[in-house]
A protein has these predicted regions:
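N-terminal periplasmic/intermembrane-space "pro-region" immediately following the signal or transit peptide
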Residues: 26-138, 352-356, 368
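Signature for the C-terminal beta-barrel architecture of outer-membrane proteins
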Residues: 201-207, 222-370, 411, 416, ...
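Outer-membrane beta-barrel "beta-signal"
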Residues: 479-492
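Bacterial N-terminal signal peptides
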Residues: 12-22
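Surface-exposed loop and membrane-interface regions of Gram-negative outer-membrane beta-barrel proteins
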Residues: 126-146, 152-207, 215-224, 329-335, ...
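Bacterial N-terminal signal peptides that target proteins for export
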Residues: 2-14
């Protein structure tokens, strides 16, 4: 494209002199014979380049199967009596049309080389041993298995179709007289099935329609809950505008209930502040039109700010701050609750990549749940295994603390023991935000991740929870709780 553009610029300042020569004989008479010959040669060069551009345009249209205009089929004429403005306009139109057709051919070549279908998947099996009722001696052992196959179709460069089938079950959960012959497939379903349109009308606009995962920000409110044996997905519509910074607007149907549907609406902004720092303001609206205690109209809004800075020696210091508020109505109660989270991170530059995180999460509680005011914060649809300890004793908030809220002070450390092994230790101190007895207890989680090869990963975790008074009262036991797991995961 530089050749065409550069030539058109060169022609621009010469056109007037060349094309006006026949109308200005005085100039020719005063000019030398050599100058006249040079100008005539330049005029021929302009005409030759013009014809080359017209010929290239005709060939490009033929390659693309587009209709060739009659004026191109009969050959290419001379400049004739064209004025400088007319010739300049024609060259500009030719250049723009050639650029358009070249871009179109390049795009078609990329689409031809792009694979139309892509199949990926993951199969994982996890053994869990748990004694978490705070009464020693009655541990439970179960083997979980989850399999996913994901088909990605690309009929065009700007169109994708995603279909992901999932089977998630516990070993021995098949039913029937002889479970080994079970063929009911109760646990098989579509985890995701959606259409994605990109670059709508040539803009940075993307649309996703169908069953899909919704995961935003830290995951405190909306996460895929990938640790679960089924995972979470929503039936919804998402519009996204932008790339490096973007705005998402979505609606999801939680339950089809006729005229009393349960819906979730959301607006999420991811804005780049500067290198390494971002801000994410958002608001979610939950709606359930059912009358009575199930009636729901609750707005949750917040702001998340996070980033990191790297020193000259490679040391990384990061932070994440988030504040959230809730207001609305649940049943006949008024809602007014809040949550705050802060995390500070350090990562070293050595080959062991040591990382230390200090954090604090606070969820408001309610010590008078029958007074018509709900002050206990609800975490909506979180990525629950990510927060509040790996034992998952506080996965459903505020129910798991009896509306008492939660205060979690945490210290987490991780490092690489080798190129394929990473180890970590997480320690939590839990208390209630509201209540006569606030002490919940302390949890320690040890984790090891071993990457066997590029496709296979082995995870091990061992956890202990030592209860305090509030936990002993609510759970009815006073012994420490234990849990361990071993998970094998293969991706393809």
């Amino acid at each position: 494209m530089r050749r065409v553009t550069g030539w058109s610029r060169y022609v621009g300042w010469m056109l007037t002199l060349i094309l006006l020569m026949p109308a200005a004989p005085g100039v020719a008479q005063d000019s030398t014979v050599e100058t006249l010959k040079e100008l005539q040669e330049l005029r021929k060069e302009v005409e030759r380049r013009r014809n080359e551009m017209r010929r290239e345009l005709m060939l490009l249209r033929q390659v693309l199967g587009e209709e060739v205009e009659p004026e191109f089929e009969g050959g290419f004429g001379s400049l004739g009596g064209m004025t400088p403005d007319e010739l300049g306009a024609e060259l500009r139109i030719l250049r723009e049309e050639i650029e358009r057709l070249r871009d179109k051919i390049t795009l078609e070549q990329l689409e031809a080389r792009q694979e139309r279908f892509d199949i990926t998947g993951i199969v994982r099996s996890r053994l869990e041993w748990s004694d978490i009722d705070f009464v020693s001696g009655d541990a439970d052992v179960r083997q979980l298995m989850r399999s996913r196959i994901k088909l990605t179709g690309r009929p065009r460069h700007d169109t994708r179709v995603i279909v992901e089938i999932q089977d998630g079950r516990a070993w021995g959960s098949e039913s029937g007289v002889d479970p080994t012959f079970d063929a009911d497939a109760d646990h098989i379903d579509f985890h995701q099935a959606y259409i994605e349109l990109q670059e709508i009308y040539g803009k940075q606009l993307t649309m996703r329609l169908g069953r899909q995962e919704l995961a935003y920000g830290s995951g405190h409110l909306l996460g895929s809950a990938a640790w679960g044996n089924a995972g979470r997905a929503f039936d919804g519509l998402v519009f996204r505008y932008g790339e490096k910074s973007f705005v998402d607007l979505f609606v999801a149907k939680i339950a089809e209930q006729g005229v009393t549907d349960e819906n979730l609406f959301g607006l999420y902004v991811d804005a780049r502040l500067n290198d390494g720092h971002r801000a994410e303001p958002y608001v979610f609206l939950e709606q359930d039109k059912t009358l009575g205690v199930e009636r729901l109209l609750r707005a949750t809004g917040g702001l998340r700010i996070y980033g990191s800075a790297t020193g000259e020696t490679g040391h990384i210091f990061g932070y994440e701050l988030e504040g959230i508020g809730q207001a609305g109505e649940v049943g006949n109660d008024d809602v007014l609750s809040y949550m705050g989270s802060a995390t500070f991170r350090y990562r070293g530059p050595s080959w062991t990549q040591p990382e230390v995180r200090l954090g604090l999460d606070f969820l408001s509680g309610d010590d008078a749940p029958l007074d018509g005011d709900r002050e206990a914060f609800d975490t909506m649809y979180p990525a629950w295994h990510t927060f509040f300890g790996l034992m998952d004793l506080f996965r459903d908030m505020p129910e798991d603390t009896g509306n008492g809220g939660l205060l979690d002070f945490r210290v987490q450390g991780e490092m690489s023991a080798s190129e394929s092994v990473r180890v970590g230790l997480h320690v939590h101190h839990f208390t209630l935000a509201k209540g006569v007895e606030k002490g919940l207890g302390q949890e320690a989680d040890a984790i090891v991740t071993y990457r066997y090869n590029a496709a296979t990963t082995l995870h091990w975790g061992g956890m202990i929870f030592v209860p305090s008074d509030a936990m002993k009262l609510s759970r009815g036991g006073e012994d420490p709780a234990f849990k361990t797991f071993m998970q094998l995961e293969v991706r393809f």
